[in-house]
Amino acid sequence: MHTKNVGTPVQRLEDDRLLRGKGRYVDDIDLPDQLAMMFVRSSEAHALIKSVDCDQARALHGVIGVYELKDFGALADKPMILANPSPLIRQPITQYMLALDEVCYVGQAIAVVVAENRYIAEDAAQLVVVDYEPLPVVMDARQAAMTNAHLVHQNSPDNLAATVPWKFGDIDQAFAKAPHIFKESYYQHRGVVHSMECRGVIAQYDAQLDQLTVWTSTQSPYLVRRFLAQFLEREEVAIRVIAPDVGGGFGPKAAHYPEELVATLLAIKLKRPIKWIEDRLEHFLTTTQQRDQWWDVEVACESDGHVLGMRAVCTHDNGAYLPYGLLLCMTSVAPFPGSYAIGAIDIRLDCMFTNAVPTTPIRGAGRPNATFVIERTMDTIARELKLDRVKVRQRNFVQKEQFPYLTGAKLPNGIGIQYDSGDYARCLDMVLEESQYSQLEIRCKEAAQKGIYRGIGIASYNEDSGLPPYEGATVKVLPSGKVYVELGSCSQGQGLETIAAQIAADQFGLHAGDILVKLGDTISSAMALSTVGSRVASTAGPSIFLAAQAVRQKAFKLAAEHFNVSENEVNINAGVLFLKSMPDKKISLADLAKKLVAGVMVNVPQGFSPGLESTAYHTTERAVYANGSNVAEVEVDIQTGEVTLLNYWVAHDCGTVINPALVNGQIIGGVVHAVGNALFEHMKFDQDTGQPITTNLGEYLLPLATEMPKIHITHMESPSPLNPLGVKGAGEGGTIPGIACLISAIEDALKPFHVKINEYPLSPEKLLCLIEEAKIRTVA
């Protein structure tokens, strides 16, 4: 009998094709008669456009046309569609596909050049002359919130996009009876995410069929189709969106962008395919960015560290526009109270416009921000009350017997936040055991005696993964006998093709490699939302399971009729159905599938629908909560400010583990992302002019493989009761607690200097400044 696929480290099915250079990314696609487009982008962070002179560009040989917003007729009056609208939004400002009369960040598109090839298009774009009337810039969200602040949009009353409240419990009572109240402020940087593949789009229009086909490097083909249809006022069935191989997503590719819309309109206008590939500089200037928030926090607690309540004000920098609604803001407040049973929370998040690139969710969305605040606050309590950091966390955890646990908070749709399953205390114990935490403390003390500054960091988290409501899947047996899985979801390197095959294969007694998988094509796949928020394994995964189960049941019923027996007498292995009592009596899936394909004078058996196939949608109104705890060991050189990462341990609970190797890969990648956020990545702007400063990979630093510690991973499985596989998300679990854990370790290493670290990233220069400031305070 075939061994089960789910739960085993099946080698990635994608790798053979991708490693041999057989992948098919957007830039690998070239269509007959294709044109290239390039954008003329704003060199000012805030200005009025007085004039745009395109004459020289239009005169260049090989240029097909140069277009401004006014050249698109009635559509010029329409701004981009707002994703995720909310009644909390005061100013639903989205950008026009090309600037109307005002630019609000460096890199905003003003005009577009279409030419016979990219080289000509780039040269022509350089010939377009834009005359600006500069306006004051606002680059700091806190300054944007001031009553006398300059305006990011000249016709707006102020810079406040929205205010998001998040509260439950009696916060006044919690603070009134608390013997201890501590206050802290935290700053979290703005960063960029650098997928190996930048964005790109190709649009083709078939005038005879009135059909649009769009290839785009996206995490959300169905959402792109929806927004294109809404903007163009076309039926969705007249638009096909394909996500081919996508070289990394991490969140920014979940949004829809002006470039997709402009390419589509030009393809219709010119009746020729249009291609645009983003270069790395454009990526720095235009692709949505991450994380930029200021927090002022108060915590009320008892003398033993038990937290009674937390209140906070967050000032969130959303950049110049609001393309993705309040999703990033909501995911910054909704994680509270984290892994802890805290009875009262009161948070206000002010979402501010600034003259910077818009921000949207990036790996973890707002959860790393919230977890940083929560975990640093736990460290503050331990430090101020001279308590053990571990005991403070254990004292406040939601306990195993409390699941399912209602926090008291409610989503905007009125559904209460409920943690479905887990054992947070055990997960922390596991990582302490794996890291030999008590021995780590001894090692740090011994190192200190030699003048070596080592520290240990701790952080715990939980994560709402598998976001509702659905992700569809179709499973069918082809007449050849091959099992075929179609998903509207698409992969950006997570290994979705592999886990889809593993789940389906188990229903037919096959190896994962026997399954064909197709992803991310709106013309043939079941409806889908997006590959975001660690959601596909716990939404599409159960849908694959349910669809495969339905196909299996249909095959059993048909085989039972074929053998003239009851269904419970039939079994399956290696794609062959047989009688349990007489294994030699058998019929293949191929033969069964052929029975359900009608032909001339050939009918489908009575009582059966055509095709050995099924489409399923696992639907849910609640997220499933993954969780974990991390420990980091670091060494700090107080002469240079350099931080060396010695070891990193992860205990992780994502419910049923479909593929341990893939989960480990996701965790390792997530930790690397956290290292980048904590120590290296910082998108800097000139505060007076709004000009971006770190616009290449020599100035904007990413972590290298040589800077990575050994990452030790252990799994705890507490299956979720909310889906038939028991799975939870894993894609962001390395990043969400990682930043807090690393900063905690660095602060611990610098205990002799009484350094307090409430911000990131920690460059060597910043760390040296903190050490010197602490020394001065000590002397004073």
Question: Where do the PLM segments sit?
Answer:
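Flexible, low-hydrophobicity surface segments
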Residues: M1-D158, K269
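Glycine-rich loop/linker segments at domain edges
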Residues: T8, E14-R17, S86-R90, D158-V201, ...
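Extended active-site and interfacial segments that coordinate phosphate-rich ligands
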Residues: D16-R17, Q126-L135, M139, Q219-P221, ...
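C-terminal catalytic domains of large/alpha subunits in multi-subunit enzymes
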Residues: L69-K70, E233-A238, A267-I274, S303, ...
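Short acidic, glycine/serine/threonine-rich loops at helix termini
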Residues: A76-I81, A124-L127, R225-F227, F250-H256, ...
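Short Pro/Gly-enriched beta-strand edge/turn motifs at strand-loop
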Residues: A83-P85, A176-G191, W276-H283, G451-S460, ...
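Conserved beta-alpha junction segments in alpha/beta enzyme cores
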Residues: I171-L232, M330, A334, G455-L487, ...
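Thiamine diphosphate
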Residues: G249-K271, K275-I277, L496-A504
